[in-house]
């Protein structure tokens, strides 16, 4: 998973899958809507997003952020994405 400089992913959640992330390069901000606020993810940091948890990756730096993402759970496909409209 790559987030280019100055870009962000949509605020989203999944009903059936979890995602395990390892930051391999760059620094990202993880926004967990309404619960834990924003967490800064540095290289080699690990994070788990659980089913039903709103989340958004933001790259506020001048360098790309690269994340190794492992999806696991009952259903791991692109249909299992619910996006929040801002």
Q: What are the functions of these language-model segments?
A:
Residues 56-86:
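Double-stranded beta-helix
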Residues 8, 20, 27-29, 54, ...:
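Structural motif
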Residues 3-4, 27, 35, 56:
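A structural signal for the main folded, soluble domain(s) of proteins
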Residues 32-55:
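Short acidic-glycine-tyrosine-enriched beta hairpin
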Residues 1-18, 70:
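A short glycine-rich, His/Asp/Glu-containing loop-to-beta-strand
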Residues 26-28, 44, 67:
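Short hydrophobic/aromatic patches on the structural cores and recognition surfaces of FHA
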Residues 14-36:
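Glycine- and acidic-residue-biased ligand/ion/polar-headgroup-sensing regions
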């Amino acid at each position: 998973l790559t987030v280019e400089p100055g870009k962000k992913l949509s605020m989203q959640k999944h009903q059936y899958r979890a995602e395990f992330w390892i930051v391999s390069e760059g620094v990202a901000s993880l926004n967990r809507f309404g619960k834990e606020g924003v967490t800064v993810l540095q290289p080699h940091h690990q994070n788990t997003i659980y089913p039903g948890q709103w989340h958004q990756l933001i790259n506020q730096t001048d360098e790309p952020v690269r994340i190794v993402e492992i999806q696991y759970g009952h259903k791991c496909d692109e249909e299992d994405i619910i996006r929040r409209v801002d």
